[in-house]
Amino acid sequence: MKKLSVFLYTLALGSAFYSCSTAKQDTPQTDYTQYVDPFIGAADNGHTFPGACRPFGMIQTSPVTGAVGWRYCSEYMYADSIIWGFTQTHLNGTGCMDLGDILVMPFTGERHRTWDAYRSSFSKTSENATPGYYTVTLDQAKVKAELTATTHAALHRYTYEQADSASILIDLQHGPAWNEKQYHSQVNSCEVNWENDSTLTGHVNNKVWVDQDYYFVMQFSHPVIDHFELPMAETEKGKRLVASFNIQPGEEVLMKVALSTTGVEGAKANMAAEVPGWDFEGIRTAAKADWNSYLSRIEVEGTDEEKTNFYTSFYHALIQPNEISDVDGRYRNAADSVVNATGGKFYSTFSLWDTYRAAHPFYTLMVPERVDGFINSLVDQAEVQDYLPIWGLWGKENFCMVANHGVSVVAEAYAKGFRGFDAERAFNAIKQTQTVSHPLKSNWENYMKYGYFPTDLTEAESVSSTLESVYDDYAAADMAKRMGKTEDAAYFARRADFYKNLFDSSTQFMRPKKSDGTWKSPFNPSQIGHAESVGGDYTEGNAWQYTWHVQHDVPGLIALFGGEEPFLNKLDSLFTLKLETTQADVTGLIGQYAHGNEPSHHVTYLYALAGRPERTQELIREIFDTQYSPKPNGLCGNDDCGQMSAWYMFSAMGFYPVNPVSGEYVFGAPQLPEFVLHLADGKTFTIKAEGLSEANKYVKSITLNGEPYTKNFISHADIVKGGTLVYQMTDKK
């Protein structure tokens, strides 16, 4: 009875503000978590993690199999056979590393060891993960470890087969790092306090990607009979502690950890609100119900493998952004001040260069109750640091990637009718972001003087910075126009045409240009650029991949090529010419097209906008067949905070937001036979692919609510009104 009550209570919480959803939505009859495999993407370049978390939660408690080097951005590789321990925070699918806070490791036997001698082998057959739950049995320790989570707290359950010196290592020096030197020097300060024989509190400040402060409270279900600190290396400031317990063989020790950015009292309040007791099964059941309350918003027909791919994508997309404010709405902002979040919740982990493309459009459609909170968080941070977040993490800015696609995310929300934020504040943040230069990422004086970022005056990524900034200018113009700001709209609309200044008609590429107006030479359109390693004028890409980065004005881009035929000929070459140089995060290749990296994600849909929708439909099927699978290596590139997953979901339904701010989803071809989207206010939108098969991959015709539909896109407004979209599939082009 208790489990049922927790299940229903959590469903209510998960659906709060998701106004009056359908009865089926409120009490899902299907356990959709059965179709989620958290191990998908946990091998090779996917960089996902298999541990326990809640939708948009602050906590992601997960195993660590490594922490040094790019392959361990999520601290886990599926092929590894040694577990270092379990940390409480993780990034999902990123190409850079941070978090990995508070490593804990249960063990038995000798307690005094070197810091790296507490690790244990494990059998893959003992490892299992579902949304909100992870378990594994540690061979040397002979401990069964189980993890579950709430929004702000992790709950661990360790069953000790042996009771000889049953202990837990608590490592506050640990965290993912680029190299061994950084691993042993990333902590700037660390304080801990044993408040009683079962409670440890503390504060850690560290720096890998951002300057991070976290406060914690850790409690144990058994009294600690002895504890001591391990010696630290010369560059280390993070403490490592060992806590021991007096238990019998087969007995359990539970441990709960709550985090806060504001202080120990904030962490204690979070724990008291979310994990007041030791009901592991209750929290686990509530976590499952929480995930079901979201996953049930889309009903999918298809094979079990297809459902696994789809619902795992749904799961990955909802791991972030993360609610890092306390239960009372307070958080530590970018100026290190503790403040109240506008709207009561502050979110971070905004991988905006990735997620503005499809993940945020997906949130506006399927998680609309969170969108205003995301926008308020972006604007709150902008008012502290004077520009919208570029890549927001733990409430701070890490300056990763180019341009500032917080502009797009804010403008898209406004264009789609979201009004739970102050539009004047939001537009002021956009205007300041796009006009006031700041270190590292924007020199608007050069941009306005030349109409592009000159390669000789820009350290790296000049072409990508121009093209990506142009899209944000378009987004700013769109919001200004909708708000009646005529002068601002005209100003940003003029800048939105700057992409034309980098098009070299002789080569038909977007090409780096110098401040004197001449093209940079020599020029190799296949040469991959990467600011942090090889430099160059492109961001994790090349001229072949970035020439198509004009999401807001495809007709204008086609005109630069001289019409649809030369445009399509060049686009054909993209998918057939072999890439000459490689980069770790430029993957999922079909010719020069790189599905494993975000600038390519809209490109297949350009065929549909240039009069050849059948080629879009062929390529979507090829990408589904070759770049996604329900396996640990089933993602061809970094999931990038759910963007790879969001592309899959949109494309599976048969459309994609080429230009997110426009609110238009360009048609491709559906890959599963039926979807039912449970929208806000009890509405449903049904998508059917009649006649879909391996051969029938082309769309013959479309109807919307029984009427013939001839547009090459469907609008966000039409979807959220509810209705039925039917594709008639055929094997004929």
What are these regions (language model features)?
Residues 1-27:
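Bacterial Sec-dependent N-terminal signal peptides
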Residues 25-360, 364-408, 414-467, 478-501, ...:
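Accessory carbohydrate-recognition regions in carbohydrate-active enzymes
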Residues 475:
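Short acidic, glycine-rich surface-loop motifs adjacent to enzyme active sites
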Residues 472:
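ATP-dependent phospho-/nucleotidyl transfer catalytic cores
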